[in-house]
From Swiss-Prot:
Assembly: Heterodimer of a large membrane-associated beta subunit and a small pyruvoyl-containing alpha subunit.
Organism field: Shigella dysenteriae serotype 1 (strain Sd197)
The protein's name in its UniProt record: Phosphatidylserine decarboxylase proenzyme
Gene that specifies this protein: psd
Catalytic residue list: D90 (charge relay system), H147 (charge relay system), S254 (charge relay system), S254 (schiff-base intermediate with substrate)
Biological role: Catalyzes the formation of phosphatidylethanolamine (PtdEtn) from phosphatidylserine (PtdSer).
PTM-bearing positions, type Pyruvic acid (Ser): S254
Length: 322
C-alpha cells in the first residue's frame, strides 16, 4: 500500500517545480540554517564526513557546496592496472549485464530501448548493440561526483530533456522506460577499450547536472535536445580525461549508466545487482592484455560552475582547502 502511494505521487507531484525549488534553496547561503540542514541530512542519511576534505559541516556555505563535497584523495585509491576499468561512482549497482540487441535490463521483467536511451541516435546505438552496460544508483548519502572508468577522449555530448521521476529501486521496478524518459546528459568517449558512453540521468530534486569541461548543462531546462562535438586525439580543442579523473557531478542523487562496445570488456564476476560501488575499484577487465602509454589530459577550463559563482574551481578543489 505504501509503495503504491509513493508511486502515485511520482505521477501527481509537480516534479519540475519541486526540482527548481530544491535547486534554488540548496544554492542559498543561510548561515546557521544551512548548517542545521546539513547536520540533519548527515545524521538522517548517515553520511561519513571523515572521508571529506572538509569534515566540518560549518565550512560549507550552501547545501549544494556540501553536496558536491570533494573527498580526500586517499579514501578512493584508483586501481592502476591498465587492463582494468574502474567504478565511476559511489553507489549501488541497479542492474548490469549484456545489451541484447536494442534491449537493456531496467529491473526484473522490465527492459528499455538502447536507442531510446540515446535519444534516437541509431548511429551511436549501433556502437553498443550486444555490448555491456552497468547502471549505478547514487543515493542521497553518497559522494556525488562522477569519475572516469578509464582514459578517454570526449567526442560528443547530448543533452536530452525529459521527465524527472525518482530513480530509486522502487521506480526502476515500476516505471516503464524510466531511464529513457528522464532528463539526461549523454557523454561519448573514445577509449583504448573502444567507444564508451557515460550517461548522467537526472531525477526529482536533482537541481543540476554538470561536467568538468562545460560547467552546468542543466538548468536551464529549455525542452530541446542539444548536441556538442569535440575533435579526436591530440587535435586542438580536444578534451582528454584520465582514468579516475572527475568528469561530472550531480546536485542531489541520481544514476550513472555506462555502455561498452561488444567484445571489448568483461564485467568483474563478483558484481551483481545491489553490489555496493566505490570509485576506483574494479568494474570490468579488457578482453585484450596491453600496457597503456602514459597520457596527459588536455587542460580543462578553470571557470567556476555557473550555478554557484562562489563554488570551488571545476578542476582542482584543493586550491581553497581550509
Amino acid at each position: 500500500m505504501l509503495n503504491s502511494f509513493k508511486l502515485s505521487l511520482q505521477y501527481i507531484l509537480p516534479k519540475l517545480w519541486l526540482t527548481r525549488l530544491a535547486g534554488w534553496g540548496a544554492s542559498k547561503r543561510a548561515g546557521w540554517l544551512t548548517k542545521l540542514v546539513i547536520d540533519l541530512f548527515v545524521k538522517y542519511y548517515k553520511v561519513d564526513m571523515k572521508e571529506a576534505q572538509k569534515p566540518d559541516t560549518a565550512s560549507y556555505r550552501t547545501f549544494n557546496e556540501f553536496f558536491v563535497r570533494p573527498l580526500r584523495d586517499e579514501v578512493r585509491p584508483i586501481d592502476t592496472d591498465p587492463n582494468v576499468l574502474v567504478m565511476p561512482a559511489d553507489g549501488v549497482i541497479s542492474q548490469l549485464g549484456k545489451i541484447e540487441e536494442d534491449k537493456i535490463l531496467q529491473a526484473k521483467g522490465h527492459n528499455y530501448s538502447l536507442e531510446a536511451l540515446l535519444a534516437g541516435n541509431y548511429l551511436m546505438a549501433d556502437l553498443f548493440r550486444n555490448g555491456t552496460f552497468v547502471t549505478t544508483y547514487l543515493s542521497p548519502r553518497d559522494y556525488h561526483r562522477v569519475h572516469m572508468p578509464c582514459n578517454g577522449i570526449l567526442r560528443e555530448m547530448i543533452y536530452v530533456p525529459g521527465d524527472l521521476f525518482s530513480v530509486n529501486h522502487l521506480t526502476a521496478q515500476n516505471v516503464p522506460n524510466l531511464f529513457a524518459r528522464n532528463e539526461r546528459v549523454i557523454c561519448l568517449f573514445d577509449t583504448e577499450f573502444g567507444p564508451m558512453a557515460q550517461i548522467l540521468v537526472g531525477a526529482t530534486i536533482v537541481g543540476s547536472i554538470e561536467t568538468v569541461w562545460a560547467g552546468t548543462i542543466t538548468p536551464p531546462r529549455e525542452g530541446i535536445i542539444k548536441r556538442w562535438t569535440w575533435p579526436a586525439g591530440e587535435n586542438d580543442g580536444s578534451v582528454a580525461l584520465l582514468k579516475g579523473q572527475e568528469m561530472g557531478r550531480f546536485k542531489l542523487g541520481s544514476t550513472v549508466i555506462n555502455l561498452f562496445a561488444p567484445g571489448k570488456v568483461n564485467l568483474v564476476e563478483q558484481l551483481e545487482s545491489l553490489s555496493v560501488t566505490k570509485i576506483g575499484q574494479p568494474l570490468a577487465v579488457s578482453t585484450e592484455t596491453f600496457v597503456t602509454p602514459d597520457a596527459e589530459p588536455a587542460p580543462l577550463p578553470a571557470e567556476e560552475i555557473e550555478a554557484e559563482h562562489y563554488a570551488s574551481p571545476l578542476v582542482d578543489d584543493k586550491k581553497d582547502q581550509v
